């Protein structure tokens, strides 16, 4: 049976929600974007279009990985932090949204220090805070 991007998204979101994944809406969108090689804007634009059987299979593989407990950031290999897209692998911790508060405070302190201020990001995992600052 032919499936649209919208139906595939809704099904993926429902399965993630049923599994107790809090950010099911965001994660379903990220998995579909990754599987289809589309930006968020392209995905929203194409919601009424039909998907190929190959794309359905690809999304199913990704959903199975997620349901097995693999974080979506590791599946797609990218995560956004403070508006910056970062390459992510299992070698680094996934930047968390609450760490953006730390980045914001560091930015404010750096600005307050003026031109002579310096910032050192030492042994900081992915380096996301240093990049944001």
PLM features per residue range, with description:
Residues 32-109:
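Conserved AdoMet
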Residues 16, 26, 32, 43, ...:
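Generic leucine side-chain signal with a strong bias for well-ordered alpha-helical environments
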Residues 9, 28-29, 59-60, 72, ...:
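A general structural signal for well-ordered alpha-helical segments in protein cores
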Residues 1-42, 48-51:
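Non-catalytic accessory regions of SAM-dependent methyltransferases
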Residues 1, 8, 55-59, 68, ...:
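Alpha-helical structural motif
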Residues 100-133:
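Conserved SAM/SAH cofactor-binding pocket of Class I
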